[in-house]
Every structure is written in structure tokens, then in C-alpha cells.
Amino acid sequence: MRRGIRNLSPLLLLLLVVVTPGCEDLPAAPNIPPTASFIFNPVSPINAGETPVSFNAVGSSDPDGTIASYVWSWGDGTPEQSTTSPTITHVFADTPVRCVNVVYAVLLTVIDNEGGNGSASQQATVTEVPIAGSAQCK
């Protein structure tokens, strides 16, 4: 009897493998979009065409992946910039009028490793300083 069971074992094992259903693909979890966040320095004074402003988006996050790119729109007519680094420096373009504050909406869009995106914006107040030797702003 023992010999008969030994001869059947491979057949039963094969039968169990064939009868047991295979693993089915589970539906992929939906992508959770990233959250954009940034700070900048200096906040004031920002002199148009002169002051380098440092932007830092390290506070941005993606709960189910990684942030693949940071896209910055400056609001001052200069081309947007895309980078893989969360930090960047920008000098705002000269304004059309001297001694007047101009408010630009800076927009950050972060894109995650699955193509999801999130955005945040802040206002930057920029002033065109007077020409050297001319009257000072009042």
C-alpha cells in the first residue's frame, strides 16, 4: 500500500496545481496626487532685475510615491522653469514703472512619479528701484 501512495503523490500534486486557481491581478490603487508647498526668501524688499530670490519646495510631498518634477511659473513674463530639485533661485524681471510695487503670483506645480500633480501659489511683491542718481522713491 505504501508503494501505491508513493506512486500517486506526484499525480495528486500535479492535479492540485492544475485545479488550484492562479493568482489574479488586483486592481491598481488609484494615484493620490502630491501636495505642493513652498517658501521664499527674501520676502521683502524684492528689487526687480536685481534681487535673487530663493524658493524652497522641500515641504511638498507625495503620500504614495515621489515627486518627479517641480514646475515654477513666476508670473513676471519670464518662461516657466522645470527642475527635479525642490530649490531654485529667480530674479524677477524689471517692471514697467519705477517706484511702484508690482504683485506677481508665483505658481508651483509638482508632478509625481505617476503623473499626478498638485499646485500652490503665493504672491511676491516686487519694486523697480530708481535709476542711480535720480530722485528716490517716496
Task: Please name every model-derived segment.
Residues 1-6:
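N-terminal secretory signal peptides that target proteins for export/translocation
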Residues 9-20:
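Bacterial N-terminal signal peptides
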Residues 23-138:
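Extracellular/lumenal mature domains of secreted and surface-exposed proteins
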